[in-house]
From Swiss-Prot:
Protein name per its UniProtKB record: Chaperonin GroEL 1
Function: Together with its co-chaperonin GroES, plays an essential role in assisting protein folding. The GroEL-GroES system forms a nano-cage that allows encapsulation of the non-native substrate proteins and provides a physical environment optimized to promote and accelerate protein folding.
Group of enzyme by EC: isomerase
Cell location: Cytoplasm
Presence of the UniProt keyword Ribonucleoprotein in the record: no
Domain of life of the organism encoding this protein: Bacteria
Gene Ontology MF term list: ATP binding; ATP-dependent protein folding chaperone; isomerase activity; unfolded protein binding
Signal sequence coordinates: none
Subunit structure: Forms a cylinder of 14 subunits composed of two heptameric rings stacked back-to-back. Interacts with the co-chaperonin GroES.
Gene name of this polypeptide: groEL1
């Protein structure tokens, strides 16, 4: 076991503080509409230019092991906030540094760290309750666009695209961000249930030019096993042919005699039919087939449930207004399923998302929910250079997460105003604390609440303390618009922050800063000295 280097008490806290400060200084320059960029060197490829707090934080690793511990703990603040709300990472870092710096001053002066932490926790609870009171729900397309615009560093093009995407796919829909091949940033929306399985034979296409198979008012057979023989398959085919409606077949595999029969009937008899493989694999495949069955009002024909293919009736088939199948994917538009059943299925998937601990599972469940409830929107980000495109993509990601957070918990006046508006409530709470050190902990939060506003003003070239005094002297929603250097009603001006983002930033910052304040010793490996001697040269007479 390697020898350890241990720091105690004051020395330990100073090392942590230096690490916290080093990381925070790099991150907080990005805050606000006049925040600057940070350029990150990469071991290969071009440097990365970003204004995203968590991206900057993740790149920081300090040489001194004890200082690095402080930096890594604050990095955790940014990561936790990103995980919870998807945005607000820079605000969280600014708050964490403010809470720890002020707390450290009081611990050095003799305050009890455990009581300080209790006071900090109580104060945070009061502030969070107040934020929830002043929060207002997002009601209009315009407000969604404003939230996205602010989060995308005042880029209204991105804000409007995200608002349009949200409007088209709904709050449960999926919005994904991809890199475009051209200069333009565009929005593509796929409405209805879409999965990446195309037709099994090009003979199924109904349009030779587009190579698409379009089935109007279609019936859908959903089967979870292979179909290879025609005998079991014939009864249901005859019923569909008699009904005169087109048929989409989704099965694990359709091959041999069965596929040949379908192709022959399509070409010679004009039977409008298309066969595709079931999406997904294993248990996920079965779940997706059940989703399709519920969406289309049909039944999954499964031998596990005692059903046989030869006994399938028209009543067991799903129905949809339109089905579009290309060689790569299938889209079911306007499935005619029972609305309460679809809603119950969505609620069940939401519950699974909440209970899941795997990020991969959550992502796949979210995809299923989006396909069932609204659709999928893809924002393709374009720019003149790859570096600019990556920077823009970061901003689109932030804006997308901020928008989802706003829809979930509502909005607050932005620009650090909401936190400043909680100061009177926290001041009223102070006399209720009997313990002096707990009261000091609450005062630490009181002071920290002004830190984001001061930093936004500082990044805009103004004196933070003066701006803060001016905002405190004004009424509820009035704050400082750093972009225009004016005091204005933040809600009317469209400068909004999602409640979830502000709440998560404060909670994460207070949690980690509280832990750092109660730290009394640091243990780190002693770095091994690297040998600078050159390797021995082989002697001249050696054989090779």
């Amino acid at each position: 076991m390697a020898a350890k280097n241990i720091k105690y008490n004051e020395e330990a806290r100073k090392k942590i503080h230096k690490g916290v400060k080093t990381l925070a200084e790099a991150v907080k320059v990005t805050l606000g509409p006049k925040g600057r960029h940070v350029v990150i060197d990469k071991s290969f490829g071009s440097p990365q230019v970003t204004k995203d707090g968590v991206t900057v934080a993740k790149e920081i690793e300090l040489e001194d092991k004890h200082e690095n511990m402080g930096a890594q703990m604050v990095k955790e603040v940014a990561s936790k906030t990103a995980d919870k709300a998807g945005d607000g990472t820079t605000t969280a870092t600014v708050l964490a540094e403010a809470i720890y710096s002020e707390g450290l001053r009081n611990v050095t002066a003799g305050a009890n760290p455990m009581d300080l932490k209790r006071g900090i926790d109580k104060a945070v609870k009061v502030v969070v309750d107040e934020l929830k009171k002043i929060s207002k729900p997002v009601q209009h397309h315009k407000e969604i666009a404003q939230v996205a615009t602010i989060s995308a560093n005042n880029d209204s093009e991105i804000g409007n695209l995200i608002a349009e995407a949200m409007e088209k796919v709904g709050k449960n829909g999926s919005i994904t961000v991809e890199e475009a091949k051209g200069f333009e940033t565009v929005l593509d929306v796929v409405e209805g249930m879409n999965f990446n399985r195309g037709y099994l034979s090009s003979y199924f296409s109904t349009n030779p030019e587009t190579q698409e198979c379009v089935l109007e008012d279609a019936l859908i057979l959903i089967y979870d096993k292979k179909i290879s023989g025609i005998k079991d398959f014939l009864p249901v085919l005859q019923q569909v042919a008699e009904s005169g409606r087109p048929l989409l077949i989704i099965a694990e595999e359709i091959e041999g005699e069965a596929l040949a029969t379908l192709v022959v009937n399509r070409l010679r008899a004009g039977f409008r039919v298309c066969a595709v493989k079931a999406p997904g694999f294993g248990d996920r495949r079965k779940a997706m087939l059940e989703d399709i069955a519920i969406l289309t009002g049909g039944q999954l024909v499964s031998e596990e449930l005692g059903m046989k293919l030869e006994n399938t009736t028209l009543a067991m088939l799903g129905k949809a207004k339109k089905v579009i199948v290309t060689k790569e994917d299938t889209t079911i538009v306007e499935g005619l399923g029972n609305k309460p059943d679809i809603q119950a299925r969505c609620d069940n998937i939401k519950k699974q998302i909440e209970d899941s601990t795997s990020d991969y599972d959550k992502e796949k469940l979210q995809e299923r929910l989006a396909k069932l409830s609204g659709g999928v929107a893809v924002i393709r980000v374009g720019a003149a250079t790859e570096i600019e495109m990556k920077e823009k993509k970061d901003r689109v990601d932030d804006a997308q997460h901020a928008t989802i957070a706003a829809v979930e918990e509502g909005i607050l006046p932005g620009g650090g105003t909401a936190l400043v508006r909680c100061i009177p409530t926290l001041e009223a709470f102070l006399p209720m604390l009997a313990n002096e050190d707990e009261a000091i902990g609450t005062r630490i939060i009181l002071k920290a609440l002004t830190a984001p506003l001061k930093q936004i003003a500082s990044n805009a070239g103004k004196e933070g303390a003066i701006i803060c005094q001016q905002v405190l002297a004004r009424s509820a929603n009035e704050g400082y618009d750093a972009l225009r250097d004016a005091y204005t009603d933040m809600i009317d001006a469209g400068i909004l922050d999602p409640t979830k983002v502000t709440r998560s930033a404060l909670e994460s910052a207070a949690s980690i800063a509280g832990l750092l304040l109660t730290t009394e010793a640091l243990i780190a490996d002693i770095p091994e000295e690297k040998s600078s001697s050159a390797p021995a040269m082989p002697s001249a007479g050696m054989d090779y």
